[in-house]
Amino acid sequence: MSDIYVIYWSGTGNTEMMAGAVAEGIQAAGGHANVLDVASASADVLKDAKAFALGCPAMGSEQLEEGDMEPFVEEVEKFAAGKTIGLFDSYDWGDGDWMREWASRMEAAGATVAGGEGVIANNTPDEEALENCRKLGETLAAV
């Protein structure tokens, strides 16, 4: 089984915690997780992947972080067709509209969003959110 990448941006550590839980799920299912902060990642590593995960908290008016994550996602959109992508993020306010938009964006690029929607957590992820992240990792490992 090849590496399954989990690439994220985290400002407070909440999304990083979720990335760790996704990796735990991948490993529990027998896969190998390669967890990277988006600032040290290249979208090129995902081109040959069948499945991977992306995580980013809601920023500003419910959008992706603009400095590193948005440009990364724009690159991924160019080759997302046929891939299974797990999405996860945390938020402070709102109702997760950014996640619905992000999932729709990936689907419009031809990807399948694992589980049909992303995993979200309000601020610090609770055990339910972390368990959902682990399940997401297991789903990605099965692709």
Describe the function of each predicted region:
Residues 3-4, 14-17, 23-38, 45-143:
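FMN-binding flavodoxin-like domain, especially the glycine-rich phosphate-binding loop
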Residues 9-13:
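Short polar catalytic/cofactor-binding loops
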